[in-house]
Amino acid sequence: MKEAKGKTLSKKQYLIVASMIFALFFGAGNLIFPLHLGQLAGRNWGSAAIGFSITGVVLPLLSLLAVAITRSNGVYQIALPVGKIFALSFMTLIQLTMGPLFAAPRNATVSYTVGIAPLLPKQFKSIGLFVFTTIFFAIVFMIAYNESDILSSLGKILNPIFLILLFLVFVMAFAHPLGNLSTVAVSKEYLHGTVVKGFLEGYNTMDALAGLAFGVTVVTAIKELVNNNEKKVAKITAKAGLMAVIGIGIIYTLLIAVGAMSLGHFKITSDGGILLSKIVNYYAGIFGQALLAVLVFLACLTTAVGILSAFALDFSAHYPKFSYKGWLIISCVGSFATANLGLDKIISWSLPVLMFLYPLAIVLIILSLFSPLFKGDKVMYKVTMALTLVPAIFDLITHLPAPIAGTQFYKAVSQFRLQYLPLANIGLSWVVPTILGLVISIFIHVWHRKTNKI
């Protein structure tokens, strides 16, 4: 069958695709991480920005390309060459992470931290969070239950307003800086190895996971534009994606710089949400803070509706005991419960999960990108992923917070990891085993080709 002849996209169509990719990866909930990173890195903000950009900007684009090249319809299909059990487990973990465990409740708590918490006395902040998250997830449920597109339509208006407000904050921050970028203090842990620390901080955006889980929607839209011409899909995804991630990269870099400059006026905050509220209040007063609160609330609401709807759809397909609406109820209740732990606890508990998932996602993305070279040989996937999985499990255990941190089991695992896994001291214990897995699997693949087994 002859492949349909693809159309050449106009500049306007490229911009539309780029804006879709931008919307997929850039969310108000992610603003807090580059700001906090800037405060921690201080005058080393530039090298921190490089590391953050690799995992927060470049990797998400590569995840989209992986979806396009493998012609997958979701994270399950991308992971399938490793095996059915792995694919189902990986899809489940990513959807739980993006859904009720971390990303969805984080969107609610970021919105609360930026908009409501600064207005409440300390003794009312817990009850305030309870009331806010009740309302937040009730709205999420109603919109997702009725499958309304009201928020996506609203997003077309809100996102530009939000970006304009952010642009004005940047203008004010550099015209009237809070501190000197070249002299601000560096926190103790960011004196050395700042690029790697920025790289690991980029895990918090979860954008590479989002690309694997939801990237198919963008790729499908591109296919429709080029009459299903598969050869052009990856090329257009790369071009439009590059436009989008350059924009995201600039915003993240400026936020890191603003976070670093803020040290001239503010102490290091527990999270970037508090800092964002303080900075906007400093430059734009209560009106600016109120506008920011409304925009962040609506932006986070839009994101939460999208990811919990996707969670319910994926789970109803792979776990059909409950319908879409049943899984939606479970995800909203679960997100509400997690959100009431507070933003700091959500971030601290998400870290070990991300330290486990990200190495697997990175390796899966790399293998998917180069799969045409080895004809999708499953041995390449199985061997490499097996050797990545082991250190990823160690990373998960050794990044668990209290009460597990400090136990004898925790100490024994940590000591073993540091003693036997190279680069474990900088959080990259998976790198050497992964390279070893790649080398072994390449030898096996070449041997199979020579003996005509593939």
Q: Which functions belong to the PLM regions below?
A:
Residues 11-20, 46, 84-97, 128-134, ...:
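Select transmembrane alpha-helical segments in multipass membrane proteins
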Residues 16-26, 172-179, 188-255, 291-300, ...:
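Hydrophobic, membrane-embedded alpha-helices of multi-pass small-molecule transporters
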Residues 36, 87-121, 300-317:
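Hydrophobic transmembrane alpha-helices that form the core helical bundles
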Residues 67-77, 136-158, 224-227, 336-349, ...:
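Membrane-water interface regions at transmembrane-helix termini and the short interhelical loops
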Residues 100, 104, 163-190, 208-209, ...:
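Hydrophobic alpha-helical segments and their helix-loop junctions in multi-pass secondary transporters
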Residues 145-173, 351-362, 381-391:
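Membrane-interface loop-to-helix entry segments
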Residues 246-275:
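Extracellular/periplasmic helix-exit of transmembrane alpha-helices
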Residues 378-454:
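A generic transmembrane alpha-helix motif of multi-pass inner-membrane proteins
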